[in-house]
């Protein structure tokens, strides 16, 4: 995880960097190239430590996030180093070759191009602002506002944009990932294999500590089970608010490193105060509900976990985000568990009838994902999203509707049953960190 701010505006970028710098506590680099200022904050997790921006000839790039398949493209010391060679080989559409969680900005001075790339589910924040002849691109909205831009816009996921560097006219764009909606697979084996690979790629090639929040639910249970299967060194934290204690205790008995947290009133409000001042704001209006991460009690629970992880030098957080939005739509068999469910989790014979449903890309996908990103980012921690792996999502879409509808969160349930990992069948309990404070 990193963060960046880029602008042609004459401003001192370090004055815009207070919140953004928390995402990249290892180093901050600032360069001015042909009248454009580049600021990059680095959290070093993968490969050799490479400062950004990366410059090759007349092309400059910055990366926030991870490219998991970078070693397929050559002998690179770090993932960011593959970007410009791929751009030179494939052109503007090079991002279709990437497997990762990323936001990327490239400036090609020779061609007078500004290019932005955001991964399939916009897992890494990216904001843009234009004002008369000035423009800015940043990981955080606050950086652009502090630079004097009035109305920054959040860049949507699964897209690439090309702008003329002189007048900001859009001269190219495309969708990075096109999903196939043919529901033709009649077993869960390929989904399970894709899930195992999704975990493996997110825990490899790093010496940083790995952790997750472990509840009694399906999603964190599956991640924990697979980490155990792969022999990964990790820590699991549980906020004992409204969790099923029997299930949680069974799970923790299987761990070498776990902590059950009975969150106190004082700590809850200490975390709330820290997030109020040191976490980026995120408000999102939606047709189902509006959202403010600083009013979400789950933010305080995640903050309490990240504070402990930070002290233990654990820098990689594996999140279960996306499973509810994609695999269940917050419902089952047509019954909505929450009102923001689009179709009650009853998948039709033809996915074209509903795809993309609201929370696939939008709604709680954006709201809760950015809660994960911004809260963890305030502690210098990178969030990774196994359930938003594009191949895993594709494998789910390929499952027949009968397999999707067989049981609640069917492929995850199948996986947990395969490995006899304890879980509450058919149960969905939201993360209510403000409940049962001690």
Predicted regions and their residues:
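Non-catalytic, surface-exposed connector residues within folded enzymatic/regulatory domains
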Residues: 77, 406-410, 425
């Amino acid at each position: 995880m990193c963060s960046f701010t880029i602008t042609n505006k004459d401003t001192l970028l370090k004055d815009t960097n207070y919140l953004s710098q928390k995402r990249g506590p290892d180093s901050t680099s600032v360069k001015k190239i042909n009248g454009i200022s580049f600021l990059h904050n680095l959290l070093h997790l993968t490969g050799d430590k490479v400062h950004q921006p990366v410059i090759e000839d007349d092309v400059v790039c910055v990366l926030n996030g991870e490219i998991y398949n970078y070693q397929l493209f050559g002998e690179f010391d770090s993932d960011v180093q593959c970007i410009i060679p791929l751009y030179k080989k494939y052109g503007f559409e090079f991002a279709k070759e990437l497997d990762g969680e990323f936001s990327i900005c490239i400036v090609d001075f020779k061609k007078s191009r500004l290019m932005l790339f955001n991964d399939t589910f916009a897992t890494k924040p990216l904001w843009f602002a234009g004002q008369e002849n000035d423009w800015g691109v940043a990981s955080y909205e606050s950086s652009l506002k502090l630079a004097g831009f009035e109305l920054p816009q959040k860049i949507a996921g699964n897209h690439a944009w090309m702008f003329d560097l002189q007048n900001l006219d859009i001269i190219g764009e495309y969708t990075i990932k096109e999903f196939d909606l043919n529901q033709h697979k009649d077993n869960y084996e390929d989904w399970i294999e894709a899930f195992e690979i999704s975990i493996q790629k997110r825990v490899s090639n790093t010496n940083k500590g790995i952790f997750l929040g472990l509840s009694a639910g399906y999603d964190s249970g599956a991640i924990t089970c697979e980490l155990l299967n792969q022999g990964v060194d990790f820590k699991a934290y549980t906020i004992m608010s409204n969790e099923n204690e029997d299930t949680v205790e069974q799970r923790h008995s299987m761990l070498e490193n776990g902590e059950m947290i009975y969150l106190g009133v004082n700590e809850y409000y200490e975390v709330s105060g820290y997030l109020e001042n040191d976490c980026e704001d995120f408000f999102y209006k939606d047709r189902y509900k509006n959202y403010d991460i600083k009013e979400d009690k789950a933010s305080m629970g995640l903050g309490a976990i990240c504070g402990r992880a930070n002290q233990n030098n654990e820098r990689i957080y594996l999140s279960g985000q996306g499973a509810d939005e994609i695999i269940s739509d917050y419902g089952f068999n047509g019954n909505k568990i929450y009102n923001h469910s689009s179709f009650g989790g009853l998948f039709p014979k033809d996915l074209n009838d509903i795809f993309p449903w609201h929370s696939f890309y939008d709604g709680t996908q954006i709201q809760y994902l950015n809660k994960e990103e911004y809260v963890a980012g305030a502690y210098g921690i990178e969030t990774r999203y196994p359930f938003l792996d594009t191949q895993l999502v594709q494998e789910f879409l390929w499952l027949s509707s009968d397999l999707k509808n067989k049981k609640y969160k069917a492929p995850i349930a199948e996986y947990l049953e395969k490995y006899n990992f304890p879980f509450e069948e058919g149960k969905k309990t939201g993360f209510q960190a403000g409940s049962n404070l001690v």
